[in-house]
């Protein structure tokens, strides 16, 4: 897991493929987009714009991916994301290969970050993460998740 702020993107230390993907997403002006999927570079890089209310972590499950890296960028509101190191997800459901995700009930040695608008978090394949968790009181957030095919890092 890595995190940073859009305003200091050039010094964030991201792999060039991730920096390019985030730059493409920002150029597409996600804050002005309706919720939905937007292709940036075919299936290699796309973004999902979403608006929803944050929830208690006990109401949510962690997610894992195999083929894609997640760059979670908060546009409005405040969001807590719980996460763990690769291999720490427990009580996992069947993997959905077509949509590249698996849901898990728990994360061993769970950690947390709080995102504010303009902040992003990067989750590599295999790193469990539970986005959309409440900070204080539930509230509406708008975010974009940039999906980057992991083999672009090769």
UniProtKB/Swiss-Prot annotation:
Gene Ontology CC entries for this record: cytosol
Catalytic activity: N-acetyl-alpha-neuraminate = aceneuramate; N-acetyl-beta-neuraminate = aceneuramate
Species annotation: Escherichia coli (strain K12)
Protein name, UniProt field: N-acetylneuraminate anomerase NanQ
Domain comment, as recorded: A His-tag on the N-terminus blocks activity, while a C-terminal His-tag does not.
Keywords: Cytoplasm, Zinc
Any GO BP: N-acetylneuraminate catabolic process
TM region positions: none
Pfam family, one: DUF386
Cofactor descriptive note: The Zn(2+) ion may play a catalytic role.
Deleted gene: phenotype: No visible effect on growth on Neu5Ac at pH 7.0 and 37 degrees Celsius. Shows slight systematic growth delay at pH 6.0 and 20 degrees Celsius. No visible phenotype on glucose.
Lineage: Bacteria, Pseudomonadati, Pseudomonadota, Gammaproteobacteria, Enterobacterales
